[in-house]
């Protein structure tokens, strides 16, 4: 029976989609709906550490999917912030580590919308390596001032994706959300 089923199988041809405001909205709604469902499921689990871990992994997947499609690959954006003067070899980086974002969401410190739109940066690979060497790869000294994770390790200047220079010592998470509010995909 299995052999016959395999012999009859015809591989589907999936259509390609062009990025439009509608495709970004589709991805946004899909990720939001699934993250909301997973957060609710996480809160209902009692005494099953492996299931909790699997749910955290699933939340991470949808957060990263949104960040990849709706921010990194978004026309004219590539990240919320860019390191000024970085060469072509850059990494897409979360100013607040992705696991911390997920944990903030699970503890209700931030909303799903805020988790989807946390600050991201195009950071030179050399500076990213310095960050890792300093032990800041998956932690941060200050979530309110998200750039302090960098300023404690190296000097650099940053601008928004549309060219506004920001002060990494004083730019707050609240300023980030206010500045980028118009880019939220609803």
Pin down the residues of each PLM region.
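Histidine-centered nuclease catalytic patch
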Residues: 84-115
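Nuclease and nuclease-like effector domains acting on nucleic acids or nucleotide cofactors
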Residues: 1-87, 134-186
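Short Cys/His-centered divalent metal-binding micro-motifs
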Residues: 114-140
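Residues that flank catalytic or metal-binding motifs in active/ligand-binding sites
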Residues: 91, 119-120, 146
């Amino acid at each position: 029976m299995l052999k016959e089923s395999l012999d009859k199988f015809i591989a589907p041809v999936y259509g390609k989609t062009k990025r439009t405001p509608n495709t970004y909205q589709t991805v946004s709604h899909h990720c939001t709906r699934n993250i909301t469902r997973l957060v609710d499921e996480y809160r209902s689990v009692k005494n099953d550490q492996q299931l909790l871990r699997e749910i955290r992994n699933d939340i991470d997947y949808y957060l990263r999917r949104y960040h990849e499609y709706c921010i990194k690959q978004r026309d004219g954006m590539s990240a919320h912030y860019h390191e000024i003067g970085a060469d072509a070899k850059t990494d897409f980086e979360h100013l607040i580590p992705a696991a911390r974002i997920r944990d903030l969401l699970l503890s209700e410190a931030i909303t799903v919308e805020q988790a989807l739109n946390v600050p991201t940066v195009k950071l030179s690979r050399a500076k990213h390596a310095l960050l890792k060497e300093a032990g800041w790869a998956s932690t941060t000294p200050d979530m309110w001032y998200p750039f302090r994770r960098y300023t404690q390790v190296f000097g650099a200047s940053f601008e928004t994706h549309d060219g506004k220079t920001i002060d990494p010592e004083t730019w707050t998470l609240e300023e980030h959300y206010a500045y980028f509010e118009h880019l939220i995909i609803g």
